Curated annotation (Swiss-Prot):
Name listed for the protein in its UniProt record: Branchpoint-bridging protein
BP-aspect Gene Ontology terms: mRNA cis splicing, via spliceosome; regulation of mRNA splicing, via spliceosome
Database matches in InterPro entries: BBP-like, KH_1_KHDC4/BBP-like, KH_dom, KH_dom_type_1_sf, SF1-HH, SF1-HH_sf, Znf_CCHC, Znf_CCHC_sf
Species per Swiss-Prot/TrEMBL record: Cryptococcus neoformans var. neoformans serotype D (strain JEC21 / ATCC MYA-565)
Assigned protein family: Belongs to the BBP/SF1 family.
Key words, A-Z: Metal-binding, mRNA processing, mRNA splicing, Nucleus, Repeat, RNA-binding, Spliceosome, Zinc, Zinc-finger
Location(s) in or outside the cell: Nucleus
Domain KH: from-to ranges: 251-330
CDD domains hit by this protein: KH-I_BBP
UniProt region (Disordered), positions on chain: 1-141, 178-199
Zinc finger (CCHC-type): 368-385, 393-410
Length: 546
């Protein structure tokens, strides 16, 4: 085998001829292959210009990409980037670590970003993570002095309610005293739109909203405890805070239904509908918001926060139940107006009737018949049926519509005509009686009370009072002559009375007593003048009462 004369390159077995200049001579390290490249240190491994730590402990299996795998550069990882994984690690083979596919979590790289805590209420990030539980925190335990801790099985429902009310009241009082009124982050409701007062201060901050909610709940619980438990004594500051009466707001959907006049339906004619709802519920209703006051007019009180709010009804009362009753009445009016056509709304129809009655223009058309179809409930111009010309024909015999007198079924019945005439006479007699005048007497026209009354004159002998002889008798026992009768003088005097003779009255000397021309008692012929008077009138003289 040929060998070069000078050994300059060396082989895998023989190292290069390098001699140490200082120290003891020793063998150099074994020479590696030309393709060998030294592996960088574990703490300074680089990948695409970015440092990656603990690469050996990471699982290189494929997993779905998420937001944390998003790169900030345009480099893409490929097979060339894994060239360092092909070399043996610490003298072992180049195969990867054998681990189970069920190995989870701890060896994987934590995602970038802030770690989300399971319990949002735990603000201590450095401490151990709190386990979520359905039970409350031990620090929030409520201890009510004097209240039993163990609840027995023989407790009634009322006692359980009172116990729950006392525990909840103590919890609310503790929160209000310590100022811990804001619940944890996971139990908060979405924040509303910021609202400011006239001075630019925000009136609906988170703390103010939750404090007001707790105070309202405390007021309701105290009212409930006072009603259910006679031994309960409200707190001292309750009467002071009771000045803020319970109230509620009912917003009017004017934007959803701009064509409906909710304001008029709630107020009614001259405010009667609003007053009626206040009487039924016992609450006070005030309409506030945009559109409640005409432009250019100011309200008596200053309500800047209400003027900027939407149109609503502010309800205040002494009791929460009255507020709920009033809210139900207002919602009923709003729902009826929004779901019922205007022509079928009975509430609005009654308001129009009341307004016409107040103005004096009401015409009661409900009980009148339609002249076209004969039905109730509408007039002739509102009749849905076609025009019936026979409805305008009135029978003069029976008074019915739709036929003439010659076609009337009761044409030959005399009772119809007699009844019609009797009805006319009775109406005329009643009218004359109301006017204080005596009407013509007709058969059957006398009232039953007058006929059956004691001492009443029978109808057949009823005559005018000036035709009765006893009405002409004077205090002296004589009789006056009837009007326009050519009789003269007093001929008969009453017994025991001084007769008018020639000595007292010389002008009456020629008058005789008991003659036809004189007036005496009926027994002596004094009533003959009445007989002659009635004979001249074509009537028979009635018998004088004795």
């Amino acid at each position: 085998m040929w060998r070069p004369a000078a050994k300059t390159t060396g082989t895998n077995d023989v190292p290069l001829a390098n001699k140490r200049r200082f120290g003891l001579p020793e063998e150099g390290p074994p020479s590696n292959s030309p393709s060998y490249a030294p592996r960088p240190a574990a703490d300074i491994q680089y990948f695409n210009g970015r440092q990656e730590r603990e690469r050996d402990a990471r699982d290189d299996r494929e997993r779905p990409r998420d937001d944390y795998d998003r790169r900030r550069d345009d480099y893409v990882r490929d097979d060339r980037d894994r060239r360092y994984d092909d070399y043996p690690r610490d003298g072992h083979s180049d195969r990867r670590d054998e681990r189970s596919k069920w190995d989870e979590g701890d060896r994987r790289e934590a995602p970038r970003g802030r770690e989300r805590s399971r319990d949002r209420g735990d603000s201590n990030e450095d401490g151990p993570r709190k386990r979520r539980s359905r039970w409350g925190d031990a620090s929030a335990k409520v201890n009510v002095p004097g209240m039993p801790v163990a609840v027995m099985g023989n407790v009634s429902q009322t006692e359980l309610d009172n116990y729950a009310i006392h525990v909840r009241l103590e919890e609310i009082n503790r929160k209000l005293r310590t100022g811990d009124v804001v619940p944890p982050e996971g139990q908060r409701s979405p924040s509303p739109t910021p609202q400011y007062d006239a001075y630019g201060r925000r009136t609906n901050t988170r703390e103010l909203r939750y404090r007001k909610k707790l105070e309202d709940e405390r007021t309701r619980l105290i009212d409930r405890a006072v009603k259910s438990d006679p031994n309960f004594r409200p707190p001292v500051d309750f009467q002071h805070k009771r000045g803020s009466r319970p109230q509620d707001k009912v917003y009017i959907p004017v934007k959803e239904f701009p064509e409906i006049n909710f304001f008029g339906l709630l107020v009614g004619p001259r405010g009667n509908s609003l007053k009626k709802m206040e009487r039924e519920s016992g609450a006070k209703i005030s309409i506030r918001g945009k559109g409640s006051v005409k432009e250019g007019k100011g309200r008596a009180g200053n309500f800047p926060q209400d003027e900027e709010d939407e149109l609503h009804c502010l309800i205040t009362a002494d009791d929460e139940s009255k507020v709920k009753t009033c809210v139900a009445l207002i919602n009923k009016v709003i729902e009826t107006a929004a779901s019922t056509p205007e022509g079928e709304n009975d509430h609005k129809r009654n308001q129009l009737r009341e307004l016409a009655s107040l103005n004096g223009t009401l015409r009661d058309d409900e009980n009148q018949l339609c002249q076209n179809c004969g039905e109730k409930g509408h007039r002739r111009w509102e009749c849905p049926q076609q025009r019936v010309y026979s409805a305008n024909v009135i029978c003069r015999i029976c008074g019915g519509a739709g036929h003439m007198a010659r076609d009337c079924r009761g044409r030959g019945d005399p009772s119809l005509t007699q009844n019609k005439q009797t009805a006319f006479d009775s109406e005329y007699t009643a009218l004359m009686a109301e006017l204080g005048e005596g009407g013509g007497s007709t058969p059957g026209s006398a009232p039953a009370a007058a006929i059956g009354a004691p001492g009443a004159i029978p109808p057949q002998s009823r005559v005018p009072p000036w035709r009765l002889p006893e009405n002409w008798q004077t205090n002296s026992g004589g009789f006056r002559g009837p009007p326009n009768f050519q009789a003269q003088g007093y001929q008969q005097a009453a017994p025991g009375a001084a007769a008018y003779g020639q000595q007292a009255y010389p002008g009456y000397a020629g008058y005789q007593t008991g003659a036809v021309s004189g007036y005496g008692s009926p027994a002596t012929g004094g009533a003959d003048a009445y007989a002659a008077y009635y004979a001249s009138m074509g009537q028979q003289a009635p018998a004088a009462a004795v």
